[in-house]
């Protein structure tokens, strides 16, 4: 499997999981869905994640690509959101997914969220192997910058 086809596979699977997380039917549960307060908190978290996603997209500039394979004429971005985490787009998706989980209040979303987290972790490892080949400075950037979750107090 080529890097491009592997990247396309990861992206397709990512969209399927996001679709399932957001649009899967809300199954009836004997425990009910989220309370109004928890649902409201979930929606607020989705809004925060959406803002993070927008800033992450903008921060990549011309290096933005839907695939985990770096653009041929792209540059290693280590400023803005990328100074806090190596994969702020994935972080934003995880934040938004957590908000969806809270808003939904049903166990199927928890399972899909865990699958999405596992996929994004695998996709990030693949992407980082390609970034290391393309950008010699990536190793030192990776040593000082967390993968998904920003360090507190930094």
Q: Which functions belong to the PLM regions below?
A:
Residues 1-78, 95-154:
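Membrane-anchoring alpha-helices and their flanking helix-loop junctions
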Residues 83-91:
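Histidine-centered phosphotransfer motif of kinases
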């Amino acid at each position: 499997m080529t890097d491009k086809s592997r990247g396309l596979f990861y992206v397709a699977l990512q969209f399927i999981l996001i679709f399932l997380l957001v649009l899967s039917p809300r199954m009836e549960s004997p425990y009910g869905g989220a309370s109004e307060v928890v649902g409201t908190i979930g929606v607020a978290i989705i809004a925060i994640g959406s803002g993070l996603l927008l800033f992450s997209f903008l921060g990549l500039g011309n290096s933005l690509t839907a695939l985990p394979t770096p653009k041929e004429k792209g540059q290693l971005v280590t400023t803005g959101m990328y100074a806090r985490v190596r994969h702020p787009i994935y972080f934003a998706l995880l934040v938004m997914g957590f908000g969806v989980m809270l808003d939904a209040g049903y166990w199927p979303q928890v399972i899909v969220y865990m699958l999405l987290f596992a996929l994004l972790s695998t996709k990030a490892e693949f992407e980082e192997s390609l970034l290391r080949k393309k950008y010699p400075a990536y190793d030192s950037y990776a040593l000082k910058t967390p993968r998904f979750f920003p360090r507190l107090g930094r």
